[in-house]
Amino acid sequence: MQLALDSISKKVGAQTWLYDMSLALQSNAVTVLLGATQAGKTSLMRIMAGLDVPTQGRVLVDGKDVTGTPVRERNVAMVYQQFINYPSMKVFDNIASPLKLRGEKNIDARVRELASRLHIEMFLDRLPAELSGGQQQRVALARALAKNAPLMLLD
């Protein structure tokens, strides 16, 4: 998947959060966004994921304009700085949720494989609130990896 931002900007009220910018991400590459606090990194990633729409400009995936396309149709995984887990669901079900939504087979094996890779297999029967912050972040990462999305954004 190739993702490109073409002359995007983002305004919220009278404030400009992102100024006219273009960016192209290459397939099978790791791209790092560095910037000061409040520089717009999260806003930029939210636009890439389809969670926000730019005020101006276009978001292109493999050359196709997907600006405004709902996040569910983008096949993008995102892990937030303030991670999000489903508090009433056990860790196993948190990781399994995207697999169940897609009707995947072998959910148990896939969840256990991801949990093992991230060293959280011993927590599968616990609720997220019973884990440390770092362990909860790994649960969020495992859920994102379970999506097997061609683009993963880590905030």
How would you describe each model-predicted region?
Residues 89-96:
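Short coil-to-helix segment of the ABC ATPase nucleotide-binding domain corresponding to the Q-loop/switch region
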Residues 146-150:
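A short, proline-enriched helix->beta-strand linker immediately N-terminal to the Walker B motif
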